[in-house]
Curated annotation (Swiss-Prot):
GO cellular component term, pick one: extracellular region
Residues carrying the site annotation Cleavage: V10, Y11, I12
GO term, biological process aspect, one: blood vessel diameter maintenance
Alphabetical keyword list: Pyrrolidone carboxylic acid, Secreted, Vasoactive
Family: Belongs to the neurotensin family.
Name of protein: Neurotensin
Modified-residue entries (Pyrrolidone carboxylic acid), positions: Q1
Gene: NTS
Quaternary context: Interacts with NTSR1. Interacts with SORT1. Interacts with SORL1.
Keyword Secreted tagged: yes
Function: Smooth muscle-contracting peptide.
Domain of life: Eukaryota
Compartments reported by the entry: Secreted
Amino acid sequence: QLHVNKARRVYIL
């Protein structure tokens, strides 16, 4: 995923 949503960036963590 190129674009990283604010809510998604926490998911990646």
